[in-house]
């Protein structure tokens, strides 16, 4: 039986220097000797920010066809360098940009929506015995090459895995998913297995582990994902269908604005749902809470500060009035997982008191609890919530596992 193809995506940190590119090439060559492999390359660390800076220096519009051509070049260079490193090891390798790889998109420049994958060229390269090395973060739009938003290489990898019926490996600069960002919370614990739904909640809450749309596509298509470190593959997190475990994680999302407003009773629930869909095209982590009475709708919307004005414009186009409320510099801290057990409100209050936090808004929906606080209170609240909901739990969820 032919082994399933593995789509292995390397993040920018893993490709940050020529020596790391050579190490990645050695890993890929060793893996390709055992199973068919497709590689997805991110831009090297710092390159995308450098390219955006160049666009700003010449006074260019970041959301334009020309800007996307500039920004997409970072991944194209990474893919070509990785292909060259593989060739030096005696392996046939072919670098492909998003168009050549058969990735098709619609929507706006800089945040295009991946709509379809036609991996004919990738299959041809695999059949020839070569290793396809695909530039992530980009796809073909009718009028040119468009980018998929920051973190879009994750989406490239998951979409290719779905189209090729393969497995996805995301090689990151952390060895696994954790119950919190270990850089912010030293007590964070690794997670060995989580469900697609849990990953999607993590990503949407602001965890920098996976592009939110990549998590959604993986869940919809049933793509198994393995998160691992580019230097330490012994520790990993496997993402798949619900496995019966009930982990809890705490996520900080900084630089958030709260928009509040009202809408007339004539506005339908479908319109409110459309607002959420359109806002998530702008900001994948946007959150909307809405309540309705005989006078109409009351809404609260959390978006990034950079997208608040465009969010207000989107709402206006749907007949919904929004405005920035109070302090526009907020952080949201989300507790994700099974938090419905007795006493959760007491643990929440204890964490808020410990952090000396002043919540601006508190929302609970399903398996997620969201607390909005002034930005300076975000990290203390993250640590306090982690202690209450993770560290004081009867048994820690995360343990190391072998590759």
Region annotations inferred by a language model:
Residues 1-215, 304, 340, 367-377, ...:
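Nucleotide/pyrophosphate-binding catalytic subdomain
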Residues 41-48, 227-239, 295-296:
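Terminal amphipathic helices with adjacent charged low-complexity linkers/tails
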Residues 44, 174-176, 221, 229-234, ...:
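Glycine-rich beta-alpha junction loops
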Residues 91, 165-166, 223, 284, ...:
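Short glycine/serine/threonine/alanine-rich loop segments
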Residues 186-192, 201-255:
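Phosphate/diphosphate-binding glycine-rich loops and adjacent basic-rich segments that engage nucleotide
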Residues 238-403:
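A conserved regulatory-domain signal marking ACT and ACT-like small-molecule sensing domains
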């Amino acid at each position: 039986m032919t082994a399933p193809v593995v789509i292995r995506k390397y993040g920018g940190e893993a490709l940050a220097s020529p020596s790391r590119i050579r190490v990645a090439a050695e890993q890929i060559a060793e893996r390709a000797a055992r199973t068919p492999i497709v590689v997805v390359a991110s831009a090297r660390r710092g390159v995308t920010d450098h390219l955006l800076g160049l666009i700003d220096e010449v006074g260019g519009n970041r959301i334009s066809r020309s800007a996307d051509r500039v920004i997409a070049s970072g991944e194209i260079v990474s893919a070509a360098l990785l292909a060259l490193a593989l060739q030096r090891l005696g392996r046939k390798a072919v670098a492909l940009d998003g168009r050549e790889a058969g990735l098709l998109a619609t929507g706006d420049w800089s945040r295009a929506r991946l709509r379809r994958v036609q991996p004919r060229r990738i299959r041809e390269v695999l059949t020839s015995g070569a290793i396809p090395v695909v530039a992530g973060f980009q796809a073909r739009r009718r009028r040119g090459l468009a980018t998929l938003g920051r973190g879009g290489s994750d989406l490239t990898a998951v979409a290719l895995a779905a189209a090729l019926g393969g497995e996805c490996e995301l090689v990151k600069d952390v060895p696994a998913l954790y119950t919190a960002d270990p850089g912010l919370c030293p007590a964070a614990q690794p997670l060995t297995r989580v469900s697609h739904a849990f990953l999607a909640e993590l990503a949407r809450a602001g965890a920098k582990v996976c592009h939110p749309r990549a998590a959604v596509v993986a869940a919809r298509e049933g793509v198994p994902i393995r998160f691992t470190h580019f230097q330490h593959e012994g520790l990993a997190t496997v993402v798949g269908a619900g496995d019966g475990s009930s982990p809890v994680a705490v996520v900080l999302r900084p630089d958030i604005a709260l928009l509040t407003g009202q809408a007339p009773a004539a506005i339908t629930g479908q319109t409110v749902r459309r607002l959420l869909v359109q806002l998530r095209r702008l900001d994948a982590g946007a959150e909307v809470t809405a309540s309705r009475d005989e006078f109409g709708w009351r809404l609260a919307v959390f978006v990034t500060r950079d997208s608040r004005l465009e969010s207000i414009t989107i709402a206006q186009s749907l007949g919904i009035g929004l405005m920035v409320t109070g302090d526009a510099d907020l952080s949201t801290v989300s507790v994700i997982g099974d938090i419905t057990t007795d006493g959760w409100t007491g643990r929440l209050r204890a964490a808020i008191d410990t952090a000396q936090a002043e919540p601006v808004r508190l929302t609970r929906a399903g398996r997620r609890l969201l607390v909005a606080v002034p930005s300076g209170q975000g990290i203390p609240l993250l640590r306090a919530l982690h202690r209450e909901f993770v560290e004081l739990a009867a048994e820690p969820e995360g343990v190391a596992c072998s590759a």
